Structure formats: structure tokens, C-alpha cells
Amino acid sequence: MAAAAVVVPAEWIKNWEKSGRGEFLHLCRILSENKSHDSSTYRDFQQALYELSYHVIKGNLKHEQASNVLNDISEFREDMPSILADVFCILDIETNCLEEKSKRDYFTQLVLACLYLVSDTVLKERLDPETLESLGLIKQSQQFNQKSVKIKTKLFYKQQKFNLLREENEGYAKLIAELGQDLSGSITSDLILENIKSLIGCFNLDPNRVLDVILEVFECRPEHDDFFISLLESYMSMCEPQTLCHILGFKFKFYQEPNGETPSSLYRVAAVLLQFNLIDLDDLYVHLLPADNCIMDEHKREIAEAKQIVRKLTMVVLSSEKMDDREKEKEKEEEKVEKPPDNQKLGLLEALLKIGDWQHAQNIMDQMPPYYAASHKLIALAICKLIHITIEPLYRRVGVPKGAKGSPVNALQNKRAPKQAESFEDLRRDVFNMFCYLGPHLSHDPILFAKVVRIGKSFMKEFQSDGSKQEDKEKTEVILSCLLSITDQVLLPSLSLMDCNACMSEELWGMFKTFPYQHRYRLYGQWKNETYNSHPLLVKVKAQTIDRAKYIMKRLTKENVKPSGRQIGKLSHSNPTILFDYILSQIQKYDNLIIPVVDSLKYLTSLNYDVLAYCIIEALANPEKERMKHDDTTISSWLQSLASFCGAVFRKYPIDLAGLLQYVANQLKAGKSFDLLILKEVVQKMAGIEITEEMTMEQLEAMTGGEQLKAEGGYFGQIRNTKKSSQRLKDALLDHDLALPLCLLMAQQRNGVIFQEGGEKHLKLVGKLYDQCHDTLVQFGGFLASNLSTEDYIKRVPSIDVLCNEFHTPHDAAFFLSRPMYAHHISSKYDELKKSEKGSKQQHKVHKYITSCEMVMAPVHEAVVSLHVSKVWDDISPQFYATFWSLTMYDLAVPHTSYEREVNKLKVQMKAIDDNQEMPPNKKKKEKERCTALQDKLLEEEKKQMEHVQRVLQRLKLEKDNWLLAKSTKNETITKFLQLCIFPRCIFSAIDAVYCARFVELVHQQKTPNFSTLLCYDRVFSDIIYTVASCTENEASRYGRFLCCMLETVTRWHSDRATYEKECGNYPGFLTILRATGFDGGNKADQLDYENFRHVVHKWHYKLTKASVHCLETGEYTHIRNILIVLTKILPWYPKVLNLGQALERRVHKICQEEKEKRPDLYALAMGYSGQLKSRKSYMIPENEFHHKDPSPRNAVASVQNGPGCGPSPSSTGSTSKSDESSAEETDKSRERSQCGVKAVNKASSTTPKGNSSNGNSGSNSNKAVKENDKEKGKEKEKEKKEKTPATTPEARILGKDGKEKPKEERPNKDEKARETKERTPKSDKEKEKFKKEEKVKDEKFKTTVPNAESKSSQEREREKEPSRERDIAKEMKSKENVKGGEKTPVSGSLKSPVPRSDIPEPEREQKRRKIDTHPSPSHSSTVKDSLIELKESSAKLYINHTPPPLSKSKEREMDKKDLDKSRERSREREKKDEKDRKERKRDHSNSDREVPPDLTKRRKEENGTMGVSKHKSESPCESPYPNEKDKEKNKSKSSGKEKGSDSFKSEKMDKISSGGKKESRHDKEKIEKKEKRDSSGGKEEKKQYPFHLDVFSQYNGKL
């Protein structure tokens, strides 16, 4: 009562006299209107009286006031005294419990005040005797209690005395005879009841005993239950309702002995009486045993025992003896199982279920723990039988398979039994509820299991095809929810308890495959993680399954796959989740189990395969597992093992892929790319598409062919029979619309790996994740392109502008996805046009192909415009951009070699089949047919590709004129081409790398206007440091392949003059004059000749060496790794020059030593490359054989060295005359400013070794002299240069020789300035800043300009220069004499053109030396000091004027003769001096023990032809010694007599060299060279240092 809502507010009590009393009376009046005792108003009235009385007890209200108001209320109800007595009774108990004297006193006063309202009799009945005594209503409570006991005993326990001996025999005999007669006639229960009444009255029978006899007869005659029920109903109307229940309870008590067994007839009678409501279940339930708390204890004990068994099974057993002990314990436990004690509640429950009284049975089961009742087999079978009966009509209608008859189940005759289900809607009434109580114990009735599954399958078919109204849909949704619940709670747990029933598993899959994978996986998750903990039996089953799985897995090997597989299959039919969870845990630990496990899974059911897919996903999504190893640089081995297992198992078995694919997509949405490894493996195994960077060139070549060639020769492993598995993968992607989303997510995640996912991760891991993401995208896109039909592909992939602008897909990925669509589109259009005109000529076919291309690609050309800013399209056209990105290697070339190779393999295979005598004839025939069919397919595919390539080339030939617009310079065009086309695509895939190189070659071969091949190659090779440093590991590999293909082309041109002349000689791509206009010209003089091209190639090789050494010296992990990968890829074509190879070899050897302990992966890479490099050493050649170095005109070479576009005019190419020294100064500027200029690698070599201090002094003296000479010359020629006007050629007018802008006074107008800036060779930002500073310094010191050919004639200029030349020569002679010891002055290994050291001021010259000389080398330090004098003189003689005046041939010859005569005289004088010094040194050496000076050793080696390998090797390409000086001197001496132009000069020179290289023996050559050295005058002084130390391939064709 105290917990009820407050009826009397406290405010009423406070204001009792004013308003509270009236409010209370009003409330009581309202509550008294309903006189019923069952209504809520009655309870509220009691509550009001209670609260009023309680306020009196608390002292809030006086008892007089309460008694007065109670007196007024007594008029409202007649039962007021009884209600008030009940209130007093409750308050009496409460005040007794409180033990507070004040409240007890208040209570006593209140009751005394109300004695006139409640009679004494009522109070004595309700109140406690002690309270009555305190009120004075009784004298002593003790006496009152004794009297009460006596009266109760007399009333309730004193029995009436009957004469049993006389009356019982006859009376009860007649009663039994009456009840046992034949009841089939017209006898009714009313008639029998009247007879029973007569017997009771006649024989004075006890009515209770009569009732007991009736029940006994009812037990014996259960078939007449209708008769006895009506009889008992009539009989009980004369008795108290509880009598029948007490008698039944007494009967049940009788059997509650230790070994007693209650008869089933008694259970049935009780069940029937309950069903007809003759007794109440609650009244009978208390008479039954065991008690509920005992049942609960038993349930807990069973769970504890099950857990104990689990602990025993999971214990580690170390010996076989312990195993035997465990088996003995199991046997003992089985023997200990005794007959369970009689459970009357379960017996009654079974009887209720048998007669169909579901409501009472449900009430009993609700009193027990979950599934406790159903865990008893009899109960479970009774529920199953009831369900059989209930679902029979529905099952007959929808569940019986076609052709099956089945055995019908008869319905219960009991009208009170549950109604049978006629429709799916009827299942909700009782059937689903019954299943919920049955739980996992449906396992006792497999037939019912199958029936339910079939009904569920029929419902799902109807549900999926239902197009009814909304109301019906809502109903079916509810039924579906119930069906899923039943599956979760009943079907799957029951399957776990069945003993390896494969049929039930397959039957269940029939229903499961109609569920979406989301529903299935939720059910599997519940089954695996929740179900096994809900029941003791399932706990035991789980433990036993794990124990058995351990036993099998310990013994699983490749040899016993079949028997072990059968055991695994048997175990998996019932408990797949537990089994697979354990197997996957073992695979994650031991990857060598993958293959045996995959092979052993062939005995699984379809349901088991689906469960396996779920278990794999759950294992992948395990949040407790780290996806990285402890070093945080590599992906965990467990993930790699799972990925490998996934690929193998999904390929081999028909497993649904939707869940796995969606999981990967979800991970990508969440920004996690680790699990792409799974997708990569699945696509590789199922579709046979392999992505690897270790592909051989043969495989790459095969990948450029058709699909058949790719499958046969493009992959490492011949993955056959992928048709079915790839079809399954395709169906899964299309059915769930995951094809495009996965592509887009992967394309976007590439950047996400770097900017979102890679924040705290190691750079190595980020690179691996990026590569994994990218490789999977390429692999997945390739799968879609080769497997999806044209319609499917086009329908799913949007246009290129939508992909890039709306989906934010990177351009390379967007074109990668769109490329197959364009090919499909063009092919289909072409086929349509061909069909329209059959039998047309080849020309018409090409025309139709071009038309179809235009129709398909025109919208693409418009779409790509939006991808870049409008300025981009000034350099390249959208058509060219789209053409580049839409074509593939398949379109450009036919891999005839690969086709031939694969066809030959098949022929060999067929021959082997013929030779095999053991093979059965039938198999032989099949294999031969297969090989023949493959051969025919390959040949047909090759023919088809040939036709296709021809059509594509025709199309490109027509398009090429519109590709590159002449709106801007070629330099900018090449920049955009590389930036937007080549570089993004060459690192996209290995085949794309090859494509990019071949495309550049194709554009060159097509003679595309405005395309400079030379500039393109130069930009690619000049500085690869930044590109290499920014690559991931796989990108570096692809970039290396790209460079390899580019080098292959360059090497082919370099190695043979005829090839070069044929493929490059008259091509616009090799023009050295780059004009701003679109005119490419056909002037032969504009072309780069063969020898100069070889110089350029050497420059490129040097640049590659320099970049490689720089990367190797950084110490950065990615720099070193990437450059080693690139070097490994380009090893077939680089290095070719011996000194460059040696520089690389030393640096790589150093890496091997440094990284052996620190970074083993780099050590392994370096060791691998080092070994390969050593094996290639025999193919390397000296530098002088790589490119021919002679005093031929160098204008074209210098122009290329300084970058195409900043070279001289054509007329300067053939000139052999020299300009004044300002030309040398400006050439130095151009070399320093150009993009192709050599960057510093190291500054260490600028210091001079201590051992050569005397040389250093002489060098410094020489430097001072040179510096003074510089200043004088600068002053004398400043005026002369200012007066000269710009040169005649366009480039000379726009640019100086250094490729930079002229000073303001030399620029005619702003237009020329604008043109000049466009034609400038592109540089990096750092180089620009550096060159600007140098330009300012030089302009202040020299203010040199290009001489104008028109202002003065060459003769006049020569006369002006003659005095200054003589002064220069005199100074050189003095400085030469200062050099003691007869040291020879080899030229330093710089790649720059020969700059006279004397022309450079001392600080600047020192700075340049520091930049060039990167490593301190004894041999090199001497060359640096002595080369100043030689370079000064040689530069005065041999420097070429870039803009010569138009002199006549006779004048040129005269000038040449004068120069050469003077130089001969000076050289002869020096040679005599040198010979004298040499003899003195030999004499000194023989007489003393002094060391041979290193320069003398060097000279001797040169004289003996061993200059290529010196004792002190340079440590970088910058220090490479000047190779084979003898050839230079020979050529110089021979060239002194020549009086021809540059072309004849070159050809004669080449003839001399080639004849010398081929015919003369080494010994003869050495003698001749020594003689020529003695005879030559000024040989040393006339030595030239070319801008490139380049290899000439024509000299060593035979060696390669």
C-alpha cells in the first residue's frame, strides 16, 4: 500500500479545518460510488483511509479529527467497518515492525477513538492478540490464542464417523460398476451422475472418495474423456472448486518417493482436466516435484559441468599416457550416468503437449530455464509432433517437392488444440512460438527440420516475387523477421547438434541462398559468437569440435589430403563456424598449410562454403590483430596468408564473393587500404590476371598482344581453367554493382594512402600500400576490361569528364578505365560500317575505321578540354592528348616474336605428346586437339592485330598534323607533353612504360610537326633525381622500364650511322634550330649530324651517372632503393662507358658495405645490382670508342649540350675558324645557364693533395697570369663588342650563345625579347636562380656580347685579335715553363665544353673547380692544375664562333693555314723541351730511389695504350680521366693539313678513326702514336675538351 500513488495530499492535512476535511470527504464520496471490490476505485478508497490514518500515527492529525471524518464517511459505504479493520490490521503490523513507541501510542488512540465504527468481533478477527489486549478488547492474549487453537481443531480436523466396513464394499463396488459399464449406448453423464448421487445417499459414501474413484476409472478409460469430462463438470458443480485439484495433488504426492514413477495415465488425466479448465494450473503446480529452485540449480550445474568438460578438452596433453587417462575418464563418466529422478512437471508438460494444450504447456515452460524442458528428448519430440500437426496443411500445399508423396500427419481430434496453419500468415499464431520453445532440440526430428526449411524457401520465393499492396508487404516483412529469428534460434543450433547430417546442411542452403548475404552473415555471426554459449549441450559440442579439429590439423599434410579432407567435411556439416575459425587461425600462423587446407575442403556443402566466406571476412576484420609487423614497414604475415588462402579457395570452390567484395569496398570507404591485398589475390587467382614488376621482357611483349597471347605467355604461372571462376567474380560484381565503385575507391585511395592513411606510418610502408592500391586498380581494371561485355562496360563507366570532375578520379586512372570503352566503341562502330558495305577494298576499310574513330573520339576531345586549364591547349591539342591516353601497345605494334614463340611451344608440346607412348590414345587425341586449337587461335589473333595496327597507324598519319599546335615554343610543348602525358603514364604500369617510350618513337617516326625528339629525349635523361626520388618501389621499376626502352632506341641510333641516317637523318625531331614558328624546315644543315648525336648520347649517359651517384650518396632510403631498381632495369643499355661504369661500381660497393647491417633490403638490392654490373663489365668500352673526339666543328654539339634550341645557326656548324675570346666567354655562360649543364655532386675534390704542393704553386702563378690577361682582354674588346649588331640567324638575333637574353642595348625590340624567352631551354627553379646570379657577375666583369658577322669581315677581326692572341700565347708559355717535372696536363673529367681557365677570374674559377671536381684523387688533382695552360691555348685556337661572318672559302683556308702553322711551331718547341726533360727524369730515376711521379706513370700508360684504366681511379663521373689522348693528337696532326669544310673534315676524320680501329694491331698503333706525338708540334696545346665525354658505338659494334 505504501508504494501506491498518494491520494491524500499533505496540503489537505495542513489545512484540515479550512479546506482539507471537505476535500477529503469529497474524494471519499466520489470513490464510494463504485461498490465493486475489484475495481481500482475500491483500492483508491482503501488507500485514502490508510493515508489518513498514517498521518494520525505520524502526529500530523489529531485522532479526534480523524474519527469524526471517518464517522461521516461511514455513511457512504456499507462495508466501511470491514475496510477500516483491514487498514487497522496493516497499520498494526507496520507499527509493530517499526518499534517506535510514539507511533504505536498514536495508533492505539486512533483505534480506541474508532471503536464505535468497527465492532469488537471484526477487530478480534483482524488484529493481533497483543494489540487487542492493549485496546482492552480481551483480557489476556495467551488465553485467547489457546482458545482459538481449540476451536479450529474442532472445526477443521475432527472427522465424521462412518461405518466403513458395512457400507464401503457394496457402495464403492456399485460405484465402480456404474462407471465401468459400456458407455457406447444411450448412457449419458447426467444419468450416471444421478446414479452416483443415489449411491452416495444410500450408502452414505464420502463425496471426496467418490471423486477419487471417478478419477481412477478415468485414468483406466482415457478413450472416453468426453464422457468423464462432462461427468466431472457436473459433479464439481456440487463441490468446492479446490477439491478436485487437492485430490489430484494427493495422487501425485503418492508417487513422490525416491524410486517412484508417476504413471503416464495420471499425467494425461491431469492434462485433460487442465485443458477443460476443471482445475487451475497454479493450484496443481505446487503439488508437483521437483521444485522450481531445484530445476534452476540443476540447470546451472549442467552448464558448470559443460564448462568443466571444455576446460579438460582444452588442456595441453604432453604424453600418450595422459591421453589414455582422459579416455578412461570419459568412459567412467558415461557409466556414471544414472536414470534421472521422476520429474512430474515435465511429465505433465509432455501430456499437455500430446493432447494439444499449448497454452498450459507454454505456462509450465515459462516457469523453467530457457530450453530446459526441450532438452529432454520426450518433451522435444512432443513439441515436434505438435508442430508437425499444426503445419501439415501448409506444408502439403507449398513444401512437398515435386514427385514426392510423403506421409500425411493426422490432426488431433481435440477441438481445443491449436488451429492448423493454412497460410504463411497462420504461422505467426502458434508455430513460430512453438519453435522458439523448442530451440536447438529440433535436432531430434530431422524430418520436421526439412519441412520447416522447405516452407521457408517457398515463402522467400513468394516474398521476392511479390508485387502486392503495401499492407501485404508489411505482413510479409513481419513473417520474414520471424523466419530469420527461427533460423537463428532453432535451425542453426539444431544443425550443430545433429550428427554430421550433410543432407540437412544442403536443405538449409536451399533457403539460405534466397537470403541476401547481409542476412546470412548476421545469422552466421550469431551462430558462431552467441549460440554456443546459450546451452550446455552446445558448449560441449563446441569443445568437442575444436578438439577434433586440432586432431585433424595436426595430421594434415599434402600426402593425406583426401582422408583428412573427408574428416574435415564430416566435422563441418554440423559445426562449420567453429571448425573454420580454428583452421583459419592455423593458416594465419603457418602459411605452409594453405595448399593442403584448400585441397581438403572439397567435401564441404554449399552452406559450409558460405560460412567459410563469412569466417574469412570476420578474421580479416578482427580489430585485435595488427595489420603491420612490429617494424611498421611491412604488412603482417597473417594478412598475407589470409589473402593467399582467399585467392586459392575462392578460385577452386563456388563461394559467394559478394560479402568479401563489399567488405573491401567498405574498408576503402573508411580510408583503409590494407585489405586490398585480398582483392588483389582473388582477382589474380580467379581471373588469371597477374600483376608483378618482375615480368621479363618476353612476358611484357606478350602482354602487348591479344587476350590469348596474354594468357599463354604473359604470366609466370600458366593459370588455366579460369573461365568459370572469372565468370563468378564478374557476376558478383555486376549483381551487387561493385565494379565501378571499387575502381573509383581504389583510384581515390591512392592519394588517400599518402595524405590520410600515411600520416604516422613509415615511408616504406606508405609506398607499399600505394603500390598495392595502384597495382590492384590496374589488375581490377584489366579484369573488367577483358571480362565485361561492351554493353555492361559502357553502361557502368561514365564519360571521362564525369569521372574526373564529379568523381574526382585522377586523370591516369580515369583514362585507364575509359580506354577499353573507347576500343569497344570504335570496334563496334567499325563493324557496323563494314557490314553496311561488304567486300569493300582495304582503303575503304581504313577510311571506315578512321570514320568510326572520329565518331567515337569527337565527344572525348570535347570532354578532355575541361580537364586542364585553357593555356595547356596552346601547346598540345585535345586530339593529341586524347589519342595518347586512349591508345595502348596493342594499337602500336604486333609482337610477332611472342606469337612465334608461343606457337613453337605448342608445336614442341604436340611433338612430346606424339612421342609419349604411355599416354592413352583418347587423351593424346584430346591434348593434340587442344594444342591445335590454341595454335589456330594465336595465328588468327596475330593476323587480326596486324590489320588493326595498320589501321591505327593510318589514322595517326592523318591526325599528326593537328597534334602539336605552333602557338608556343617547342620547349613548352615538350614540357606539357612530358608533364601531362609521358610521366603520369610511364609509371602507371609496366606495359604503359613501354607504351610511352614507343609512342615517343612513333611520334618521331611520323615526322610530327613541331615535335622535337631531341629535346624530348634530352629532358627525359637530363635530370632523373627528382623523378626517381618521388617514386614508390613499383613506380621506380616502371620508370626504369621506360628509361630502358628509351635507351634502347637511343642505343640503336647511336650504334650505327646508317640506322641513324635512315631513322633520324631527315626527320624534324632532330632539328637543332628550334624556331618559334611552326616551320620545321628541311635544311640539311639544321639537322644534328651523327657524330654530334653520339656526343649527346654520351652526355645523357653522364647525366644518368651523375644522378645515380647523387641518389646513392644521399643516404635516404627511398633514393637509394629507387635508383638501384632503376639501374637494374636499364642495365642492358647502361652503363656502356667504362669510366662511368666504374664510378657506379665503386659507389654501389660502398652502399653494400654501409647497409649490410643497417638496412638489409638495400644491401640485397645493391649486391644484386653489383653482381649484374660486374657481369656486364666485359661489354663496357672506353669513352673514346663511345664517341669520337676530334677538332671538328662543335657548334652543333655545343648547341645540343646547351639544350636544343639554344645552339648556333646552321651556318656555324661547318665553320672551322675561331672567333675572338668573347665567344669562349659566352660559350661558358651558355654552358652554365643551360638546362643540360652539369650540377655539382660533391665539393671535396676542390682541395689539392698535400703531396703536390709545387704543382699547386705553379698552378696559382698560372692563374694570376690568366687573371691579368683576362682583365686586359675585357677592356680591349668591350668597345668592339658593343658596336656589333645581332647575328643574321633568327636564333642568334634572339639569343646570345649562352642561350640567355642579351643586355638591353643589344635587344632590338620587345617582340624579340618575348621570342627569346620562349626559345630558352627549360630549367628548374634552383638552376634559374643560380644562373641569374652568375649572369649578373659575369655581365659586370666582362659585358660580352655576340659579335656581329655583318659589321666586320673575318680578316679584319682576325687582325684585331692577333696581338691579343700573341700576348695570350706568350703568357701561356711562361706559365708552362713554371710547371716543373714535365707533368702532362690531362683534362679534367668535366662534361662541360672547354672553357679557358685563364678567361675566368680567380674566385669564379675556383668556385667552378669546386663544382666540377667532386672527389679528391691524386691523379685528378694534378690534371686540374696543369690543364689551365693547355685549355687556354687550345681554346684560343679551337673555339668556334657561333655566328660567323659569311667568309669565302679561300679566306677561310688562309686563316686556317696561318693558325695551324703557328700552333705547329709552338708545339714542336715544347715537344723538344718535353723530350729533354723526360730523358733527364729517366736518368734521375735510374740513379736514385725516388718515387716515379704519378703524372709520369700516367703518361707512360697513355703511351702504352692503357690510359683507360689508371692507378688512381676517379670516384665520380665528374673525375673521369680524359681517355685515349693518342687518338686526339693523331687526329689533330692529321687535321692540320685539311683545307676542306666541316662535312669533308668530319667524314675524313671518321674514316681515319675507323680504319685505325679495325686494321692496325695494338702494337703498331702504339708505335705510330708515339712517333706522331714526337713529330706533332703543340700536340698538348691543341688538345680539345669536348662538351661531352661520349661513347661512339660505331667503334665497338663487334665488341657488343
From Swiss-Prot:
Region named Charged domain: 1175-1597
Biological source species: Plecturocebus moloch (Dusky titi monkey)
Record region (Bow domain): 164-534
Keyword Iron-sulfur attributed: no
Name of the coding gene: THOC2
Regions annotated as coiled coil: 293-339, 896-965, 1464-1491
Stored PANTHER family: THO COMPLEX SUBUNIT 2, THO2 PROTEIN
Biased composition annotated in UniProt, kind: Low complexity: 1208-1217, 1251-1263
Region named Disordered: 321-341, 1184-1600
GO molecular function: mRNA binding
Family that this chain belongs to: Belongs to the THOC2 family.
Taxonomy of the source species: Eukaryota, Metazoa, Chordata, Craniata, Vertebrata
Motif (Nuclear localization signal): 923-928
Protein name stated in the entry: THO complex subunit 2
Function: Component of the THO subcomplex of the TREX complex which is thought to couple mRNA transcription, processing and nuclear export, and which specifically associates with spliced mRNA and not with unspliced pre-mRNA. Required for efficient export of polyadenylated RNA and spliced mRNA. The THOC1-THOC2-THOC3 core complex alone is sufficient to bind export factor NXF1-NXT1 and promote ATPase activity of DDX39B; in the complex THOC2 is the only component that directly interacts with DDX39B.
Modified residues (Phosphothreonine): 1385, 1443
InterPro entries (UniProt xref): Tho2, THO_THOC2_C, THO_THOC2_N, THOC2_N
Compositionally biased region (Basic and acidic residues): 1218-1234, 1265-1285, 1294-1343, 1353-1383, 1449-1504, 1524-1585
